[in-house]
């Protein structure tokens, strides 16, 4: 994590002030009436995905009483370990106690739950952000039959499996997988080694800018994917049970940050660039402008988990009962409280 410069601090602080969580705003008074967090050090994952935007608002987290905010790099080794366990890569970091909170793709969370990982989902963060790209002659999911599909993690195969099963394909025999965490699927596509691949921000914006292939399915616009959360916020189950005040305070800061992503995308994009999370302001702004961060008050996160869990179960990718997994690995108390407190 780069050292925070004065300019970065001022940008972060200005955005924090815009939320009303600092100073003597209404939320500042609410914070003062609550007990302090049981722990003041918290850890998040750090990766290149624009989806992490709500996690980087250090001043919002500091306003909640956290004095030591750490970011742990997500690496290729994390992906390989998760692949071996049939778990979601970032959720696997939570399960191993390497981070306290992280955003993770909903199907990956279900895989980690099924693998026995001690993760607890707290909230949805935003709706769809990924798109499936393919060669020009591939016009639909059904056209993937007999093709080669690239992913950088085995967990991505789970998503494509449930998507293609809806159109009658059996991914185990109808197309060939190429999965390598050390390679970018986009590069393999350019080299002609694969016929289709998934892209998420910021790679998604680069694919568009370079006019590489075309969109087969977009979770941003195409149902049912556009109607469900893409990334969700999760914590270690032990953390949520041991530190309920800290858990609520972290969630509040991140949901306020999500509001800022929706209302101030230009300022948030600038912050991400200044803090070294991404290099391209234009790609980041495009992603923040498209991704729906404004839905956490209205969309039910449990609906998303149940939708993906049922499809994963039908595909034989998870063994446990979807209802049991959701009952054991979710805690909506904090979200319900914050929906009442942070009315739009």
List each model region and its residues.
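Solvent-exposed, polar/charged alpha-helical surfaces in well-ordered, non-transmembrane soluble domains
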Residues: 92, 142, 158-162, 187, ...
């Amino acid at each position: 994590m780069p050292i925070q410069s004065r300019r970065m601090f001022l940008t972060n602080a200005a955005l924090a002030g815009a939320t009303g969580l600092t100073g003597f705003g209404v939320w500042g008074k609410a914070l003062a009436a609550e007990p302090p967090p049981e722990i003041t050090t918290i850890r998040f994952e750090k990766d290149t995905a624009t989806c992490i935007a709500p996690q980087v608002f250090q001043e919002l987290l500091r306003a909640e009483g956290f004095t030591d905010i750490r970011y742990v790099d997500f690496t290729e080794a994390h992906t390989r370990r998760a692949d071996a366990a049939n778990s979601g890569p970032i959720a696997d970091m939570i399960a191993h106690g390497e981070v306290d909170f992280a955003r993770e793709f909903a199907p990956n969370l279900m895989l980690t739950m099924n693998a026995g990982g001690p993760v607890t989902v707290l909230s949805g963060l935003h709706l769809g952000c990924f798109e499936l790209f393919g060669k020009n002659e591939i016009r639909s999911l059904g056209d993937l039959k007999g093709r080669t599909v690239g992913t950088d993690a085995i967990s991505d195969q789970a998503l494509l499996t449930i998507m293609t099963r809806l159109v009658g394909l059996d991914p185990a025999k109808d197309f060939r997988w190429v999965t390598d965490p050390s390679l970018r699927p986009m590069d393999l596509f350019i080299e002609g080694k694969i016929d289709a691949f998934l892209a998420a921000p910021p790679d998604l914006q680069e694919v568009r800018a370079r006019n590489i292939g075309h969109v087969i399915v977009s979770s941003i616009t195409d149902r049912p994917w556009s109607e469900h959360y893409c990334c969700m916020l999760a914590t270690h189950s032990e953390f949520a049970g041991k530190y309920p005040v800290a858990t609520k305070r972290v969630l509040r800061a991140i949901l306020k940050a999500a509001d800022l992503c929706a209302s101030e995308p230009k300022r948030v994009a600038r912050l991400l660039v200044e803090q070294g999370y991404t290099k391209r302001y234009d790609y980041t702004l495009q992603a923040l402008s498209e991704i729906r961060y404004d839905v956490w008050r209205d969309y039910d996160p449990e609906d998303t988990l149940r939708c993906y869990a049922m499809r994963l179960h039908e595909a034989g990718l998870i063994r446990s009962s979807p209802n049991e997994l959701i009952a054991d690995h979710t805690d909506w108390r904090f979200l319900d409280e914050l929906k009442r407190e942070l009315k739009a």
